A protein has these predicted regions:
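Conserved, well-structured interaction surfaces
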Residues: 1-4, 8-24
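An aromatic- and glycine-enriched ligand-binding surface/loop that stacks and positions planar moieties
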Residues: 3, 12, 28-35, 40-143
């Protein structure tokens, strides 16, 4: 019942966005974003129902396929980003999101204080692990 209502809401959003906002905007929810979410919800619910012996899984998997096809075949849609031999690397190292393949992005910007903490985690003295450093242990042993 709940997943049926979620799909109903997504279908409603698709209809609303179809009339108003079918342009590709990386940092806003658009018709494309709702189609992608419908695809993910359909895939998750369909496979969950299939492999847990629940009925009605084909409906959700078909919703996933139709939403995915819309994204890949609709005019002005998405495709795999290709920029030569380093396409995958270039897609993720770019300063700005690339709208050929990315449907929804977040713009990290120091000026607006929109940052992430990936490097803070990796560069911490314990590298994300709990415990004391070897240097501290050695200092305690010597004392």
């Amino acid at each position: 019942f709940v997943m049926g209502k979620i799909m109903e809401d997504l279908n409603f959003a698709i209809e609303v966005f179809k009339e108003t906002n079918r342009t590709k905007e990386l940092y806003r929810v658009t018709w494309w974003t709702v189609q992608a979410l419908k695809s993910r919800v359909g895939l998750f619910e369909g496979t969950y129902r299939k492999y847990h012996g629940l009925g009605d899984y084909e409906k959700y998997l078909n919703d996933c396929v139709s939403a995915s096809n819309e994204i890949m075949t609709a005019s002005g849609g998405y495709s795999l980003y290709q920029s030569g031999s380093q396409s995958y690397r270039n897609l993720f190292k770019s300063e700005n999101a690339i709208d050929a393949e990315i449907i929804l992005a977040r713009d990290y910007n120091n000026d607006l204080s929109l940052v992430h903490k990936v490097q803070a985690f990796e560069n911490s003295p314990t590298l994300g692990r709990t415990g004391v450093s070897k240097k501290l242990v050695n200092n305690g042993i010597q004392g």
